[in-house]
């Protein structure tokens, strides 16, 4: 099963995240299938860059976003609250 989830990048105490598509059982920082965006919670306001076409493509292929990624997608207006 594919998941759309976050993987951590950045320096210690300064997190930044990639939004990736990967197998559900793979480790957090393992290789990934596709990079669909980035998320930086340290900026004010938070910076979220998401490729909507890629996200919708992978959701169409059966990828499930994690709760955090689903919140980011909803906030960006890419998916509905369903």
Swiss-Prot record:
<protein>
    <recommendedName>
        <fullName>Small ribosomal subunit protein bS16</fullName>
    </recommendedName>
</protein>
<dbReference type="InterPro" id="IPR020592">
    <property type="entry name" value="Ribosomal_bS16_CS"/>
</dbReference>
<dbReference type="InterPro" id="IPR000307">
    <property type="entry name" value="Ribosomal_bS16"/>
</dbReference>
<dbReference type="GO" id="GO:0005737">
    <property type="term" value="C:cytoplasm"/>
</dbReference>
<comment type="similarity">
    <text>Belongs to the bacterial ribosomal protein bS16 family.</text>
</comment>
<dbReference type="InterPro" id="IPR023803">
    <property type="entry name" value="Ribosomal_bS16_dom_sf"/>
</dbReference>
<dbReference type="GO" id="GO:0006412">
    <property type="term" value="P:translation"/>
</dbReference>
<keyword id="KW-0687">Ribonucleoprotein</keyword>
<keyword id="KW-0689">Ribosomal protein</keyword>
<dbReference type="Pfam" id="PF00886">
    <property type="entry name" value="Ribosomal_S16"/>
</dbReference>
<dbReference type="GO" id="GO:0003735">
    <property type="term" value="F:structural constituent of ribosome"/>
</dbReference>
<dbReference type="GO" id="GO:0015935">
    <property type="term" value="C:small ribosomal subunit"/>
</dbReference>
